[in-house]
Amino acid sequence: MQIPLQISFRNMDPSPAVEERIRKKAAKLERFHDRIIGCTVVVEAPHRHHHKGKLYSVRVDISVPGKDVVVDRAKPSDQAHEDVYVAIRDAFDAAARRLEDEARKMRGNVKSRASP
């Protein structure tokens, strides 16, 4: 990455353990796309007035030449995102898939549909 990883926390205190997990996941993204310019990660806990569990949201913004890849896991469909590490894993898994798709497009290895 050309620009250092940026990590921010909203509605929660920063955690060195969470930051370390994010750094490891972000480092692995370079396997999927070798031209990553920068990456910003925002981990957000719900406002304190919510009463039904804490569902964390994780947003990953990745800059590659000519495009920004944004993955936002803000509204999880299940209760698994009560664990911040699961929310991080899901966001980075989705980011890896998107980066693979972008890398394929850049190489021209995208399957095209035959016209009828």
Regions inferred by a protein language model and the residue ranges of each:
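N-terminal, polar/charged subdomain of small-to-medium soluble alpha/beta proteins
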Residues: 1-116
